[in-house]
Amino acid sequence: MLGYSMGGRIALGLAVRHPDRVRSTVLVGSTAGYSTDAERAARRRSDAALADDLIERGLEWFVDHWMNLPLFESQERLGNHALAEARSLRLANDPDGLVASLLGSGTGMQPSFWGELDAVRGPVLLVVGDEDTRYRRLAVRLASGLALAQTEVVPEAGHAAHLENLPAVSAAVVEFLDRVDAR
């Protein structure tokens, strides 16, 4: 199973709660969630405020706001054409769906899996961009809690390493899956 960011948290949750169904996991720019109730509550408040802004200011404002978050700053290297394409794809989202995602599926709504990492049975590849300092720290923490973890730091990439350096991410994933299949 492979997941990026929020999708990675969902994939990790499945690997934790149903280890018999997950042979291996690839997490790109992901975490096991917030550790404390206070952190989750703060994130829920932040996501609710962002959902309100999306409703009041509209989808264009939201997409521009999202694309300009410091987390995605490294994507500037993709160039104007790729950024315009990404913006266009994001503008095709349903605003009501985005609001529902923020309020119902955001990190603050998801449980913490930090205390349950030992339930994961299969190997896990943690992929993180070398410029994504926050998620690099989180990958180190994740790796220490997972019995069969391997970390791949992708050069010249930030949070969305698969967008910023697809060849390196693809090579790491293929190599990992080849090793998993050989077991």
Per-range role (PLM):
Residues 1-3, 28:
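Short beta-strand immediately N-terminal to the catalytic nucleophile in serine-hydrolase-like folds
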Residues 3, 7, 11:
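Gly/Ala-rich beta-loop-alpha elbow adjacent to hydrolase catalytic centers
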Residues 13-17, 23-55:
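Flexible "cap/lid" loop of the alpha/beta hydrolase fold
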Residues 16-20, 140-144, 171, 175:
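Short, well-ordered alpha-helices that flank and scaffold nucleotide-derived cofactor binding pockets
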Residues 48-54, 65-77, 85-89, 101-108:
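Helix-loop "lid/cap" segments that line or gate small-molecule binding pockets
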Residues 54, 90, 134, 158-164:
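Glycosyltransferase donor-binding loop in the core domain
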Residues 89-141:
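Conserved serine/cysteine hydrolase catalytic core
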Residues 148-183:
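Catalytic active-site module of serine/aspartate enzymes centered on a nucleophile-bearing elbow/loop
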